[in-house]
């Protein structure tokens, strides 16, 4: 990157040449007028909204955690366009070009009705409401209460050809000089970047923080995030990515307001400065010795937020989005024949309550001891894509940039280095499995390593779901209409002349 830097004096000098420059995909990718439509099946998931339900020994998950406050990270696989038997072979020259996909449109369909789901904790760290206090109340050994609330309202999706990058605050490493003196002290924290995987929790009003490491009492947040890490997309890093693969574009809508104002229980780690630190009377005046206010109460204030109204007038889903110009250098080119769609939506956050009886006999009267309550949450998705066929020329300048960006692309195109042939004569034993011959050579077949194999995604296979008949699908018809590729024909008006009946002549 070319930057102007100061010299030893006060004059800024231009950067030294030459400087490597990353080209936009529009500079070397040629687009064709061939478009395909792809649509997934109806994608459904069912589970418990707060935690995994495990077997008696805890080794097997019987009911997975499925929450409306989770990210859904889809990894959509597309067919290799270079293996297509195109009807018009003049579209590209396989000796000088390679075919790639470009994303031109997407529609993320959401099923199920709009609804508000609540979260909470049966032992929530809440002393009392601090907005309208009628008397001065101190803390006791255990002030936890059963509390629930509706989370912050979030609608968001990020489109790219590599996974979405997230950020969260986590516990940092302590300096060596202070490593042995951290009991009861607040640990240092640092901002970390991680990939957003399917099932990760997003922020519901308590921040993007690793609650598993930084919430010792397991009561500061709700059950669904108390043992999780809440992540937030790192839009700043993805916007400044030199290649722009992680985020072609995104849509985001968040809203919340502080509904209740509480104070935490426990001792204050960073006490209000007083005379003990030479700050007497700077922040408060002490009360008389016979008053309750003599012992100052906890000052760890916090709100529980509310996502407020959920309405169909402010929905990001079930509507098409067209990609004309991406925010980065990659203008929608799907390297590796895959697209990553990361979704966060809790506007369909209804949790089903299912009640069953524990008695085999018919129940005549209501008895809560004989009724068992269950919680379930369901989600429904369907993803539609408009793909454009594009050509990449196999010239040195283009291949050098693609190789620097991702050398695996050239391997998929079978453009790697071809070694010289070895000796054509090999030893072939007939009875290789018998005890009379040597052990067979343990040569494992080499497979291409998946760079995203260690991450968890909702895999969607669309390798056999592409169609050229765009007018047969809802998103395809919308694309043809907005692109001006198809106009609605008016019916031809025809007029039929009717002859008048001849009058009979009177005789």
From Swiss-Prot:
InterPro entries named in the record: Capsid_L1_Papillomavir, Capsid_L1_sf_Papillomavir, dsDNA_vir_gr_I_capsid
Disulfide bond as UniProt keyword: yes
GO biological processes: endocytosis involved in viral entry into host cell; virion attachment to host cell
UniProt keyword annotations, A-Z: Capsid protein, Disulfide bond, Host nucleus, Host-virus interaction, Late protein, T=7 icosahedral capsid protein, Viral attachment to host cell, Viral penetration into host cytoplasm, Virion, Virus endocytosis by host, Virus entry into host cell
Keyword Secreted belongs to the record: no
Superkingdom, natural source: Viruses
GO cellular component terms listed in the entry, alphabetical order: host cell nucleus; T=7 icosahedral viral capsid
A Pfam family per the record: Late_protein_L1
Main location: virion
Cellular localisation: Virion; Host nucleus
Recorded GO MF terms: structural molecule activity
Subunit-level organization: Self-assembles into homopentamers. The capsid has an icosahedral symmetry and consists of 72 capsomers, with each capsomer being a pentamer of L1. Interacts with the minor capsid protein L2; this interaction is necessary for viral genome encapsidation. Interacts with protein E2; this interaction enhances E2-dependent replication and transcription activation.
Family according to the record: Belongs to the papillomaviridae L1 protein family.
Protein's job: Forms an icosahedral capsid with a T=7 symmetry and a 50 nm diameter. The capsid is composed of 72 pentamers linked to each other by disulfide bonds and associated with L2 proteins. Binds to heparan sulfate proteoglycans on cell surface of basal layer keratinocytes to provide initial virion attachment. This binding mediates a conformational change in the virus capsid that facilitates efficient infection. The virion enters the host cell via endocytosis. During virus trafficking, L1 protein dissociates from the viral DNA and the genomic DNA is released to the host nucleus.
Protein name per the record: Major capsid protein L1
Organism (species): Human papillomavirus 9
Underlying gene: L1
